[in-house]
A protein has these predicted regions:
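Charged, amphipathic alpha-helical linkers/stalks
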Residues: 293, 334, 340-375
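Electron-transfer interface patches adjacent to heme c in soluble/periplasmic c-type cytochromes
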Residues: 185-206, 353-371
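Alpha-helical transmembrane segments of multi-pass membrane proteins
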Residues: 22-35
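A conserved active-site cap/scaffold subdomain adjacent to cofactor or substrate pockets
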Residues: 308, 312, 316, 321-325
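Helix-to-catalytic-loop junction in kinase catalytic cores
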Residues: 160, 209-212, 319, 436
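Alpha-helical transmembrane segments and their helix-start/interface "positive-inside/aromatic belt" motifs
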Residues: 4-21, 51, 100-104
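Long, charge-rich alpha-helical interaction segments
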Residues: 357-403
Length: 437
């Protein structure tokens, strides 16, 4: 039995669409087999297989019904005798040869231009500038904090997307919603964290920071300033027990013991920010030893506890603000005093700065005006001689406070230090004491 196609399918538009769809589908199958056999995780190849070619395939398939519809519509206006069969191409006719040549050259140029354009568009969408500046109003806090972070030389996509096509496609689908939210102004302020669909840290962080690496103890010096009249310095020097004292011991001791490959630490949190942890399980993968720890001060039934998500500790459970950290005022004022952008010769400048920075503002402009007004007023009321004779020093202090504020607080997006808990340490937030209570 021969396959008989409807008369409406016998038209140039449907024929071109079917040809495009067939060739594209063959390319997808071929490239998919190549990546499966070679186990290649190249993002560019994944883009072609999962994004670019399916788009071309869709267009080709779409042309088939469009051509059939147009031919059916055209045929209704003709008599049965006027209807024609399949188009005939005869290369003995010079017009046909010229038309075929033009079509071949034009198609080749179009496909090459499309390929180059798609590649460049992809390359731009993967750039730091695209991530940080395209949606400037929304992403300004993240982009600003990122530029001053230890990962400032690492591309956004290296952490947020990583290698491979699967997470690339997920990120673009997520990006479509973000474009929609920005367009309609429905982006939450501030952006909620932790991000539930963030790629696991073991697939991104550990590309550079692998657990098997030995991390020795680290000598750390911090400079603090008191809020007294002299802005007295208070220096702290301590040894951070990051790893074992001896490299031969590896990850048997220290803070990084939590990511020891021979140990699995799991926990359950009762809040979205993962700050309240009533249950922890320790498993020694070598010996099989298992210990469970329950916080009996948290009133929660066994049934409710069993329904909570069980997470395995990874980098992000402690280093939860590795690139987008918004420092508290006491911290960034200490840094500014150390650098000299805020003169420590001004009496009680830290106290005055913390007083004004404790307030909440609607806009950055409003904050800058309030800083200038209240610092001037503070010295006029409490230190009239300083206010009269050291106006330039006060102006420098005001500028330093404003600059530090703008790097860490973004009123338009309701972003400030106390919105995003930082689990490193236990100064402003409970951090380590979420589990070690």
């Amino acid at each position: 039995m021969k396959l008989k196609l409807p008369d409406s399918s016998k038209n140039w538009i449907s024929l071109v669409g079917a040809t495009i769809a067939l060739i594209t589908f063959s390319m997808i199958v071929f490239l998919f087999i190549i990546t499966s056999v070679t186990h290649s995780g190249n993002t560019y190849l994944g883009l072609i297989i999962y994004v670019l070619l399916p788009g071309v395939l869709f267009i080709g398939l779409l042309l088939i019904p469009i051509g059939m519809w147009l031919k059916t519509r055209r045929d209704r206006r003709r008599t049965e005798e006027e209807r024609k069969g399949w188009p005939v191409i005869n290369f003995n006719i010079i017009q046909h040869r010229h038309a075929a040549l033009v079509f071949a050259i034009g198609t080749s140029v179009f496909l090459m231009a499309t390929a180059v354009g798609s590649y460049e568009a992809f390359h731009y969408s993967e750039s730091v500038e695209f991530c940080g500046k395209t949606c400037h109003y929304v992403m300004q806090p993240e982009f600003t904090a990122y530029q001053g972070s230890p990962h400032a030389r690492v591309k956004c996509v290296d952490c947020h997307v990583g290698s491979g096509a699967d997470w690339y496609v997920r990120s673009k689908l997520s990006g479509l919603y973000q474009v929609y939210a920005v367009t309609l102004g429905t982006v939450p302020k501030p952006i909620e964290t932790p991000i539930t669909n963030l790629r696991p840290a073991r697939e991104t962080c550990e590309q550079c920071h692998w657990p098997q690496k030995f991390y020795s103890r680290k000598l750390r010096t911090e400079k603090h300033f008191m809020t007294d009249e002299k802005n007295s310095e208070w220096d702290i020097t301590l040894t951070m027990k990051i790893g074992s004292n001896l490299s031969a011991l590896g990850l048997e001791e220290g803070i990084h013991w939590h990511i020891n490959p021979n140990v699995r630490i799991q926990y359950k949190a009762i809040d979205k920010k993962r700050e309240k942890i009533p249950w922890v399980r320790y498993t020694n993968l070598k010996t099989g030893e298992v210990n469970e720890y329950v916080d009996h001060d948290v009133k929660i039934s066994k049934e409710e506890l069993s329904k909570l998500e069980t997470r395995t500790v990874d980098c992000m459970d402690c280093h939860n603000r590795p690139s987008h950290n918004y420092q508290p005022p006491a911290f960034f004022i200490n840094n500014a005093l150390t650098k000299g952008t805020i003169p420590k010769d001004l009496p009680q400048i830290k106290f005055a700065a913390l007083e004004v920075l404790a307030k909440k503002f609607e806009t950055t402009e409003e904050a800058h005006k309030a800083i200038a007004t209240e610092i001037n007023q503070f010295y006029e009321d409490n230190y009239p001689d300083v206010f009269k004779n050291k106006k330039e020093l006060i102006a420098k202090g005001i500028k330093g406070i404003q600059e530090s504020f703008s790097l860490n607080t973004f009123p338009e997006m309701k972003v400030r230090w106390d919105v995003y808990p930082n689990n490193i340490g236990h100064m402003e937030f409970i951090g380590c004491f979420r589990c070690h209570n």
